[in-house]
Protein backbone atom coordinates (compact mmCIF):
# COMPACT_ATOMS: atom_id res chain seq x y z
CA UNK A 1 0.00 0.00 0.00
CA UNK A 2 1.52 3.29 -1.10
CA UNK A 3 1.29 6.51 0.90
CA UNK A 4 0.92 10.11 -0.27
CA UNK A 5 0.10 13.53 1.12
CA UNK A 6 -2.64 16.12 0.58
CA UNK A 7 -1.46 19.04 -1.58
CA UNK A 8 -4.72 20.93 -2.27
CA UNK A 9 -8.25 21.12 -0.83
CA UNK A 10 -11.14 22.77 -2.71
CA UNK A 11 -14.36 21.93 -0.87
CA UNK A 12 -15.15 18.28 -1.54
CA UNK A 13 -12.30 17.87 -4.05
CA UNK A 14 -8.88 16.94 -2.69
CA UNK A 15 -5.57 16.61 -4.59
CA UNK A 16 -3.13 14.03 -3.22
CA UNK A 17 0.49 13.57 -4.29
CA UNK A 18 1.99 10.05 -4.47
CA UNK A 19 5.42 8.79 -5.53
CA UNK A 20 5.61 8.59 -9.37
CA UNK A 21 5.92 4.78 -9.32
CA UNK A 22 2.91 4.21 -7.02
CA UNK A 23 0.08 6.38 -8.39
CA UNK A 24 -3.39 5.01 -7.46
CA UNK A 25 -5.82 3.84 -10.16
CA UNK A 26 -9.02 5.77 -10.95
CA UNK A 27 -11.79 4.72 -8.46
CA UNK A 28 -9.27 3.47 -5.87
CA UNK A 29 -10.30 4.29 -2.30
CA UNK A 30 -7.77 6.32 -0.29
CA UNK A 31 -7.82 6.80 3.50
CA UNK A 32 -6.69 9.97 5.28
CA UNK A 33 -4.73 8.58 8.24
CA UNK A 34 -5.84 11.32 10.63
CA UNK A 35 -9.63 11.13 11.02
CA UNK A 36 -10.14 8.17 8.67
CA UNK A 37 -11.89 10.11 5.87
CA UNK A 38 -12.31 8.05 2.66
CA UNK A 39 -11.44 9.64 -0.71
CA UNK A 40 -12.17 8.23 -4.16
CA UNK A 41 -9.75 8.87 -7.04
CA UNK A 42 -11.42 10.59 -10.01
CA UNK A 43 -8.53 11.88 -12.16
CA UNK A 44 -4.78 11.42 -12.53
CA UNK A 45 -3.32 14.89 -13.10
CA UNK A 46 0.27 13.82 -13.83
CA UNK A 47 3.38 14.33 -11.71
CA UNK A 48 2.08 11.74 -9.23
CA UNK A 49 -0.92 13.92 -8.28
CA UNK A 50 -4.45 12.43 -8.22
CA UNK A 51 -7.70 14.40 -7.83
CA UNK A 52 -10.22 12.79 -5.48
CA UNK A 53 -13.72 13.39 -4.14
CA UNK A 54 -14.24 13.20 -0.39
CA UNK A 55 -16.87 10.77 0.88
CA UNK A 56 -17.48 12.76 4.01
CA UNK A 57 -16.88 16.29 5.22
CA UNK A 58 -13.47 17.80 4.43
CA UNK A 59 -13.61 20.07 7.51
CA UNK A 60 -10.39 19.92 9.50
CA UNK A 61 -8.22 18.64 6.63
CA UNK A 62 -4.98 20.45 5.88
CA UNK A 63 -2.16 20.21 3.38
CA UNK A 64 0.55 17.73 4.19
CA UNK A 65 -1.70 15.15 5.91
CA UNK A 66 -0.71 11.55 5.16
CA UNK A 67 -3.02 9.51 2.90
CA UNK A 68 -2.89 5.73 2.38
CA UNK A 69 -3.96 3.97 -0.84
CA UNK A 70 -6.10 0.89 -0.10
CA UNK A 71 -5.46 -0.40 -3.64
CA UNK A 72 -9.15 -1.31 -4.16
CA UNK A 73 -12.39 0.52 -4.96
CA UNK A 74 -14.87 1.26 -2.16
CA UNK A 75 -16.33 -2.07 -1.01
CA UNK A 76 -19.58 -2.47 0.91
CA UNK A 77 -21.17 -5.36 2.84
CA UNK A 78 -23.68 -7.44 0.86
CA UNK A 79 -26.04 -10.32 1.61
CA UNK A 80 -28.82 -11.02 4.10
CA UNK A 81 -26.93 -9.41 7.03
CA UNK A 82 -27.70 -5.98 5.49
CA UNK A 83 -31.49 -6.52 5.81
CA UNK A 84 -33.18 -4.36 8.44
CA UNK A 85 -30.10 -2.12 8.75
CA UNK A 86 -29.43 1.52 7.84
CA UNK A 87 -26.05 2.14 6.22
CA UNK A 88 -24.15 5.07 4.73
CA UNK A 89 -22.37 5.27 1.37
CA UNK A 90 -19.43 3.18 2.69
CA UNK A 91 -21.73 0.45 4.02
CA UNK A 92 -21.05 1.50 7.62
CA UNK A 93 -24.03 1.14 10.01
CA UNK A 94 -25.68 4.40 11.11
CA UNK A 95 -28.51 2.86 13.17
CA UNK A 96 -26.53 2.23 16.40
CA UNK A 97 -27.14 -1.52 16.18
CA UNK A 98 -23.50 -2.59 16.00
CA UNK A 99 -21.47 -4.05 13.14
CA UNK A 100 -23.16 -5.40 9.99
CA UNK A 101 -21.11 -8.60 10.22
CA UNK A 102 -21.55 -9.56 6.55
CA UNK A 103 -19.41 -12.46 5.29
CA UNK A 104 -18.80 -10.76 1.95
CA UNK A 105 -18.05 -7.28 0.59
CA UNK A 106 -18.41 -6.17 -3.05
CA UNK A 107 -16.85 -3.23 -4.86
CA UNK A 108 -19.43 -0.55 -5.76
CA UNK A 109 -18.03 -0.12 -9.29
CA UNK A 110 -19.02 -3.17 -11.34
CA UNK A 111 -19.64 -4.07 -14.96
CA UNK A 112 -23.25 -4.32 -16.17
CA UNK A 113 -24.33 -7.91 -17.05
CA UNK A 114 -23.43 -8.94 -20.61
CA UNK A 115 -26.09 -9.22 -23.34
CA UNK A 116 -26.25 -13.01 -23.16
CA UNK A 117 -26.83 -12.95 -19.38
CA UNK A 118 -29.76 -10.54 -19.52
CA UNK A 119 -33.37 -11.67 -19.65
CA UNK A 120 -36.73 -10.09 -20.39
CA UNK A 121 -39.97 -10.69 -18.55
CA UNK A 122 -43.52 -9.71 -19.41
CA UNK A 123 -44.92 -10.85 -16.07
CA UNK A 124 -46.86 -8.03 -14.38
CA UNK A 125 -46.22 -6.81 -10.85
CA UNK A 126 -49.50 -5.88 -9.17
CA UNK A 127 -49.19 -2.78 -6.98
CA UNK A 128 -52.74 -2.50 -5.61
CA UNK A 129 -52.87 1.15 -6.77
CA UNK A 130 -55.74 1.44 -9.28
CA UNK A 131 -54.38 4.15 -11.57
CA UNK A 132 -50.95 2.49 -11.86
CA UNK A 133 -52.22 -1.06 -12.43
CA UNK A 134 -54.70 0.15 -15.06
CA UNK A 135 -52.84 2.84 -17.03
CA UNK A 136 -49.11 2.17 -16.56
CA UNK A 137 -48.68 -1.42 -15.29
CA UNK A 138 -45.26 -2.43 -13.95
CA UNK A 139 -43.30 -5.39 -15.31
CA UNK A 140 -41.46 -7.73 -12.97
CA UNK A 141 -37.81 -6.92 -13.57
CA UNK A 142 -38.68 -3.61 -15.25
CA UNK A 143 -37.76 0.00 -14.50
CA UNK A 144 -40.31 2.53 -13.35
CA UNK A 145 -39.92 6.30 -12.98
CA UNK A 146 -42.13 8.45 -10.73
CA UNK A 147 -41.87 11.94 -12.23
CA UNK A 148 -43.14 15.01 -10.41
CA UNK A 149 -42.33 18.54 -9.28
CA UNK A 150 -41.96 19.58 -5.65
CA UNK A 151 -44.73 18.44 -3.30
CA UNK A 152 -46.96 16.40 -5.63
CA UNK A 153 -46.42 13.09 -3.83
CA UNK A 154 -43.40 11.19 -5.22
CA UNK A 155 -42.15 9.98 -1.85
CA UNK A 156 -45.63 9.06 -0.53
CA UNK A 157 -46.34 7.09 -3.73
CA UNK A 158 -43.01 5.33 -3.39
CA UNK A 159 -43.59 4.47 0.27
CA UNK A 160 -47.03 3.04 -0.60
CA UNK A 161 -45.49 0.95 -3.41
CA UNK A 162 -42.82 -0.42 -1.06
CA UNK A 163 -45.43 -1.23 1.59
CA UNK A 164 -47.82 -2.94 -0.83
CA UNK A 165 -45.17 -4.88 -2.71
CA UNK A 166 -43.20 -5.88 0.41
CA UNK A 167 -46.36 -7.22 2.08
CA UNK A 168 -47.97 -8.82 -0.97
CA UNK A 169 -44.82 -9.90 -2.83
CA UNK A 170 -42.69 -10.91 0.20
CA UNK A 171 -39.34 -10.48 -1.61
CA UNK A 172 -36.29 -8.48 -0.51
CA UNK A 173 -36.00 -4.75 -1.19
CA UNK A 174 -33.15 -2.25 -1.16
CA UNK A 175 -33.91 1.43 -0.59
CA UNK A 176 -31.34 4.07 -1.59
CA UNK A 177 -32.08 7.54 -0.20
CA UNK A 178 -30.10 9.81 -2.52
CA UNK A 179 -29.93 13.45 -1.43
CA UNK A 180 -33.40 13.49 0.11
CA UNK A 181 -34.67 14.83 3.44
CA UNK A 182 -33.36 13.08 6.56
CA UNK A 183 -36.86 13.40 8.07
CA UNK A 184 -38.27 11.30 5.20
CA UNK A 185 -35.59 8.68 5.78
CA UNK A 186 -36.60 8.56 9.44
CA UNK A 187 -40.34 8.36 8.59
CA UNK A 188 -39.60 5.60 6.13
CA UNK A 189 -37.69 3.56 8.73
CA UNK A 190 -40.58 3.80 11.23
CA UNK A 191 -43.16 3.04 8.51
CA UNK A 192 -41.26 -0.15 7.61
CA UNK A 193 -40.99 -1.12 11.30
CA UNK A 194 -44.75 -0.63 11.87
CA UNK A 195 -45.61 -2.65 8.74
CA UNK A 196 -43.32 -5.48 9.99
CA UNK A 197 -41.35 -5.52 6.74
CA UNK A 198 -38.10 -3.96 8.01
CA UNK A 199 -36.38 -7.37 8.07
CA UNK A 200 -36.86 -7.56 4.27
CA UNK A 201 -35.39 -4.12 3.45
CA UNK A 202 -31.79 -2.87 3.31
CA UNK A 203 -31.61 0.93 3.73
CA UNK A 204 -28.75 3.03 2.37
CA UNK A 205 -28.85 6.77 3.01
CA UNK A 206 -26.81 9.66 1.61
CA UNK A 207 -29.06 12.56 2.50
CA UNK A 208 -29.29 16.26 1.55
CA UNK A 209 -26.86 17.50 4.20
CA UNK A 210 -24.03 15.21 3.04
CA UNK A 211 -21.18 16.17 0.68
CA UNK A 212 -21.71 15.65 -3.08
CA UNK A 213 -19.37 12.61 -3.13
CA UNK A 214 -21.72 10.70 -0.79
CA UNK A 215 -24.82 11.62 -2.78
CA UNK A 216 -23.13 10.64 -6.05
CA UNK A 217 -22.02 7.21 -4.84
CA UNK A 218 -24.85 6.13 -2.50
CA UNK A 219 -27.02 4.96 -5.43
CA UNK A 220 -24.18 2.62 -6.49
CA UNK A 221 -23.86 1.32 -2.91
CA UNK A 222 -27.56 0.41 -2.82
CA UNK A 223 -27.43 -1.07 -6.30
CA UNK A 224 -24.47 -3.30 -5.36
CA UNK A 225 -26.50 -4.76 -2.48
CA UNK A 226 -29.46 -5.36 -4.84
CA UNK A 227 -27.15 -7.05 -7.40
CA UNK A 228 -25.95 -9.50 -4.73
CA UNK A 229 -29.56 -10.58 -3.98
CA UNK A 230 -30.26 -10.88 -7.72
CA UNK A 231 -27.16 -13.00 -8.32
CA UNK A 232 -28.33 -15.38 -5.56
CA UNK A 233 -31.39 -16.08 -7.71
CA UNK A 234 -33.89 -13.79 -5.97
CA UNK A 235 -36.38 -11.25 -7.32
CA UNK A 236 -35.37 -8.01 -5.63
CA UNK A 237 -36.92 -4.54 -5.58
CA UNK A 238 -34.64 -1.52 -5.79
CA UNK A 239 -36.03 1.88 -4.81
CA UNK A 240 -34.18 5.15 -5.43
CA UNK A 241 -35.40 8.44 -3.99
CA UNK A 242 -34.33 10.64 -5.77
CA UNK A 243 -32.53 10.04 -9.06
CA UNK A 244 -32.43 13.79 -9.79
CA UNK A 245 -30.25 14.36 -6.71
CA UNK A 246 -27.82 11.77 -8.12
CA UNK A 247 -27.55 13.93 -11.26
CA UNK A 248 -27.26 17.08 -9.15
CA UNK A 249 -24.42 15.60 -7.06
CA UNK A 250 -22.70 14.73 -10.37
CA UNK A 251 -23.08 18.36 -11.45
CA UNK A 252 -21.49 19.63 -8.22
CA UNK A 253 -18.59 17.18 -8.45
CA UNK A 254 -18.10 17.88 -12.16
CA UNK A 255 -17.78 21.64 -11.55
CA UNK A 256 -15.31 21.07 -8.70
CA UNK A 257 -13.26 18.75 -10.95
CA UNK A 258 -12.99 21.61 -13.44
CA UNK A 259 -15.06 20.19 -16.32
CA UNK A 260 -16.87 22.57 -18.67
CA UNK A 261 -20.63 22.51 -17.99
CA UNK A 262 -23.09 21.62 -20.77
CA UNK A 263 -26.78 22.58 -21.23
CA UNK A 264 -28.43 24.26 -18.20
CA UNK A 265 -25.18 23.87 -16.24
CA UNK A 266 -25.29 20.05 -16.09
CA UNK A 267 -22.12 17.96 -16.29
CA UNK A 268 -20.94 17.08 -19.84
CA UNK A 269 -21.00 13.39 -18.80
CA UNK A 270 -24.71 13.43 -17.77
CA UNK A 271 -25.86 10.73 -20.23
CA UNK A 272 -22.84 8.52 -19.45
CA UNK A 273 -23.27 8.76 -15.64
CA UNK A 274 -26.98 7.95 -15.96
CA UNK A 275 -26.16 5.03 -18.30
CA UNK A 276 -23.55 3.58 -15.92
CA UNK A 277 -26.15 3.40 -13.15
CA UNK A 278 -29.17 2.38 -15.24
CA UNK A 279 -27.43 -0.35 -17.28
CA UNK A 280 -26.58 -2.20 -14.06
CA UNK A 281 -30.23 -2.13 -12.94
CA UNK A 282 -31.28 -5.11 -15.02
CA UNK A 283 -32.58 -8.65 -14.77
CA UNK A 284 -30.46 -11.69 -15.59
CA UNK A 285 -31.21 -15.37 -16.11
CA UNK A 286 -30.52 -15.95 -12.38
CA UNK A 287 -32.77 -13.29 -10.83
CA UNK A 288 -34.46 -9.95 -11.37
CA UNK A 289 -34.18 -6.36 -10.16
CA UNK A 290 -37.40 -4.36 -10.40
CA UNK A 291 -36.56 -0.72 -9.82
CA UNK A 292 -38.77 2.21 -8.87
CA UNK A 293 -37.09 5.58 -9.13
CA UNK A 294 -38.47 8.92 -8.00
CA UNK A 295 -37.44 11.70 -10.39
CA UNK A 296 -37.78 15.32 -9.28
CA UNK A 297 -38.77 17.52 -12.22
CA UNK A 298 -37.22 21.00 -11.83
CA UNK A 299 -39.87 23.74 -12.25
CA UNK A 300 -42.31 21.06 -13.54
CA UNK A 301 -40.36 21.04 -16.85
CA UNK A 302 -40.18 17.50 -18.26
CA UNK A 303 -37.82 18.68 -21.03
CA UNK A 304 -35.08 19.56 -18.51
CA UNK A 305 -31.93 17.52 -19.41
CA UNK A 306 -32.00 15.49 -16.18
CA UNK A 307 -35.55 14.01 -16.36
CA UNK A 308 -35.26 13.84 -20.18
CA UNK A 309 -32.12 11.66 -19.88
CA UNK A 310 -33.86 9.40 -17.35
CA UNK A 311 -36.92 8.83 -19.60
CA UNK A 312 -34.85 6.88 -22.13
CA UNK A 313 -34.04 4.09 -19.63
CA UNK A 314 -37.53 3.34 -18.30
CA UNK A 315 -40.24 0.77 -19.09
CA UNK A 316 -43.02 2.64 -17.26
CA UNK A 317 -43.33 6.34 -16.51
CA UNK A 318 -45.73 7.53 -13.83
CA UNK A 319 -46.16 11.30 -14.22
CA UNK A 320 -47.53 13.14 -11.18
CA UNK A 321 -49.39 16.33 -12.09
CA UNK A 322 -49.80 19.51 -10.05
CA UNK A 323 -53.17 20.19 -11.74
CA UNK A 324 -54.55 16.85 -10.55
CA UNK A 325 -53.12 17.37 -7.05
CA UNK A 326 -54.82 20.80 -6.94
CA UNK A 327 -58.19 19.05 -7.48
CA UNK A 328 -57.50 17.06 -4.32
CA UNK A 329 -57.15 13.81 -6.27
CA UNK A 330 -54.39 11.62 -4.81
CA UNK A 331 -52.37 9.78 -6.05
CA UNK A 332 -51.99 12.72 -8.47
CA UNK A 333 -51.04 10.47 -11.41
CA UNK A 334 -51.76 11.98 -14.84
CA UNK A 335 -53.49 9.15 -16.76
CA UNK A 336 -52.88 10.88 -20.11
CA UNK A 337 -49.15 11.53 -19.60
CA UNK A 338 -48.19 8.25 -17.90
CA UNK A 339 -47.10 5.38 -20.15
CA UNK A 340 -45.99 1.77 -19.96
CA UNK A 341 -44.46 -0.63 -22.46
CA UNK A 342 -46.56 -3.34 -20.82
CA UNK A 343 -49.85 -1.76 -21.92
CA UNK A 344 -50.09 -4.04 -24.92
CA UNK A 345 -52.93 -6.53 -25.57
CA UNK A 346 -50.38 -9.35 -25.94
CA UNK A 347 -49.02 -8.65 -22.44
CA UNK A 348 -51.99 -7.45 -20.36
CA UNK A 349 -54.79 -9.07 -22.37
CA UNK A 350 -57.42 -7.49 -24.63
CA UNK A 351 -59.92 -6.59 -21.87
CA UNK A 352 -57.38 -4.67 -19.75
CA UNK A 353 -56.03 -2.89 -22.84
CA UNK A 354 -59.51 -1.86 -24.06
CA UNK A 355 -60.58 -0.57 -20.63
CA UNK A 356 -57.34 1.43 -20.18
CA UNK A 357 -57.60 2.99 -23.65
CA UNK A 358 -61.33 3.63 -23.09
CA UNK A 359 -60.57 5.49 -19.84
CA UNK A 360 -57.86 7.55 -21.57
CA UNK A 361 -60.19 8.29 -24.51
CA UNK A 362 -62.96 9.64 -22.27
CA UNK A 363 -60.52 11.72 -20.19
CA UNK A 364 -58.95 13.15 -23.37
CA UNK A 365 -62.40 14.09 -24.73
CA UNK A 366 -63.28 15.74 -21.40
CA UNK A 367 -60.02 17.72 -21.57
CA UNK A 368 -61.02 19.01 -25.04
CA UNK A 369 -64.54 19.90 -23.83
CA UNK A 370 -63.29 21.85 -20.79
CA UNK A 371 -62.68 25.00 -22.89
CA UNK A 372 -66.19 24.87 -24.34
CA UNK A 373 -67.67 24.35 -20.86
CA UNK A 374 -65.63 27.30 -19.50
CA UNK A 375 -66.92 29.63 -22.24
CA UNK A 376 -70.46 28.36 -22.96
CA UNK A 377 -71.34 26.25 -19.87
CA UNK A 378 -72.50 22.62 -19.78
CA UNK A 379 -75.95 23.43 -21.23
CA UNK A 380 -74.50 24.02 -24.72
CA UNK A 381 -73.10 20.47 -24.97
CA UNK A 382 -74.85 17.68 -26.88
CA UNK A 383 -76.41 14.85 -24.84
CA UNK A 384 -73.53 12.53 -25.83
CA UNK A 385 -70.93 15.03 -24.66
CA UNK A 386 -72.79 15.59 -21.38
CA UNK A 387 -72.61 11.85 -20.77
CA UNK A 388 -68.87 11.83 -21.59
CA UNK A 389 -68.29 14.66 -19.08
CA UNK A 390 -70.31 12.90 -16.35
CA UNK A 391 -68.42 9.62 -16.83
CA UNK A 392 -65.03 11.37 -17.09
CA UNK A 393 -65.62 13.16 -13.77
CA UNK A 394 -66.54 9.82 -12.15
CA UNK A 395 -63.41 8.20 -13.62
CA UNK A 396 -61.23 11.09 -12.38
CA UNK A 397 -62.57 10.63 -8.85
CA UNK A 398 -62.41 6.82 -9.01
CA UNK A 399 -58.70 7.09 -9.89
CA UNK A 400 -58.14 8.52 -6.38
CA UNK A 401 -57.42 6.06 -3.59
CA UNK A 402 -56.70 6.19 0.17
CA UNK A 403 -53.12 5.04 0.92
CA UNK A 404 -51.98 2.96 3.89
CA UNK A 405 -48.93 5.18 4.44
CA UNK A 406 -51.09 8.34 4.38
CA UNK A 407 -53.67 7.15 6.95
CA UNK A 408 -52.21 9.61 9.47
CA UNK A 409 -53.00 12.57 7.17
CA UNK A 410 -56.26 11.45 5.54
CA UNK A 411 -57.93 9.68 8.43
CA UNK A 412 -59.26 7.04 5.99
CA UNK A 413 -57.99 3.45 6.12
CA UNK A 414 -55.74 2.48 3.18
CA UNK A 415 -57.08 0.27 0.39
CA UNK A 416 -55.35 -2.37 -1.75
CA UNK A 417 -57.34 -3.02 -4.96
CA UNK A 418 -56.60 -6.12 -7.04
CA UNK A 419 -56.10 -5.70 -10.80
CA UNK A 420 -59.24 -7.78 -11.46
CA UNK A 421 -61.39 -5.43 -9.33
CA UNK A 422 -59.79 -2.35 -10.92
CA UNK A 423 -60.61 -3.49 -14.47
CA UNK A 424 -64.14 -4.50 -13.44
CA UNK A 425 -64.81 -1.11 -11.82
CA UNK A 426 -63.63 1.04 -14.72
CA UNK A 427 -65.32 -1.21 -17.26
CA UNK A 428 -68.62 -0.70 -15.42
CA UNK A 429 -68.22 3.11 -15.50
CA UNK A 430 -67.38 3.06 -19.23
CA UNK A 431 -70.43 0.89 -19.99
CA UNK A 432 -72.76 3.19 -18.05
CA UNK A 433 -73.63 0.77 -15.24
CA UNK A 434 -73.04 3.49 -12.63
CA UNK A 435 -74.49 6.52 -14.46
CA UNK A 436 -77.14 6.85 -11.70
CA UNK A 437 -74.56 7.20 -8.89
CA UNK A 438 -73.41 10.76 -7.96
CA UNK A 439 -69.73 11.51 -8.69
CA UNK A 440 -68.95 12.28 -5.01
CA UNK A 441 -69.41 8.57 -4.20
CA UNK A 442 -66.40 7.69 -6.42
CA UNK A 443 -63.93 9.87 -4.46
CA UNK A 444 -61.29 8.26 -2.21
CA UNK A 445 -62.57 4.68 -2.19
CA UNK A 446 -61.10 1.28 -3.07
CA UNK A 447 -63.21 -1.05 -5.22
CA UNK A 448 -66.46 -0.28 -7.08
CA UNK A 449 -68.50 -2.08 -4.35
CA UNK A 450 -67.45 0.65 -1.91
CA UNK A 451 -68.79 3.27 -4.35
CA UNK A 452 -72.22 1.59 -4.37
CA UNK A 453 -72.14 1.29 -0.57
CA UNK A 454 -71.11 4.95 -0.16
CA UNK A 455 -73.88 6.10 -2.54
CA UNK A 456 -76.52 4.34 -0.39
CA UNK A 457 -75.47 6.41 2.62
CA UNK A 458 -75.44 9.75 0.80
UniProtKB/Swiss-Prot annotation:
Membrane topology listed for this record: Peripheral membrane protein
SMART domains, per database record: AAA
InterPro entries in the cross-refs: AAA+_ATPase, ATP-synt_VA_C, ATP_synth_F1_bsu, ATPase_a/bsu_AS, ATPase_alpha/beta_chains, ATPase_F1/V1/A1_a/bsu_N, ATPase_F1/V1/A1_a/bsu_N_sf, ATPase_F1/V1/A1_a/bsu_nucl-bd
Subcellular location(s) of the protein: Cell inner membrane
UniProt: ATP binding residues: 148-155
Domain of life: Bacteria
Gene3D superfamilies tied to this protein: 2.40.10.170, Bovine Mitochondrial F1-atpase, Atp Synthase Beta Chain, Chain D, domain 3, P-loop containing nucleotide triphosphate hydrolases
One Pfam family, short name: ATP-synt_VA_C
Gene Ontology terms, MF aspect: ATP binding; ATP hydrolysis activity; proton-transporting ATP synthase activity, rotational mechanism
Alphabetically ordered keywords of this record: ATP synthesis, ATP-binding, Cell inner membrane, Cell membrane, CF(1), Hydrogen ion transport, Ion transport, Membrane, Nucleotide-binding, Translocase, Transport
Enzymatic reactions: ATP + H2O + 4 H(+)(in) = ADP + phosphate + 5 H(+)(out)
CDD domains assigned to the protein according to its UniProt record, in alphabetical order: ATP-synt_F1_beta_C (cd18110), ATP-synt_F1_beta_N (cd18115), F1-ATPase_beta_CD (cd01133)
GO CC annotation, single: plasma membrane
EC number: 7.1.2.2
Disulfide bonds listed in the record: none
Chief localization: membrane
Function text: Produces ATP from ADP in the presence of a proton gradient across the membrane. The catalytic sites are hosted primarily by the beta subunits.
UniProt record similarity statement: Belongs to the ATPase alpha/beta chains family.
Subunit structure: F-type ATPases have 2 components, CF(1) - the catalytic core - and CF(0) - the membrane proton channel. CF(1) has five subunits: alpha(3), beta(3), gamma(1), delta(1), epsilon(1). CF(0) has three main subunits: a(1), b(2) and c(9-12). The alpha and beta chains form an alternating ring which encloses part of the gamma chain. CF(1) is attached to CF(0) by a central stalk formed by the gamma and epsilon chains, while a peripheral stalk is formed by the delta and b chains.
NCBIfam families: atpD
HAMAP family xrefs: ATP_synth_beta_bact
UniProt name for this protein: ATP synthase subunit beta
Organism, scientific name: Actinobacillus succinogenes (strain ATCC 55618 / DSM 22257 / CCUG 43843 / 130Z)
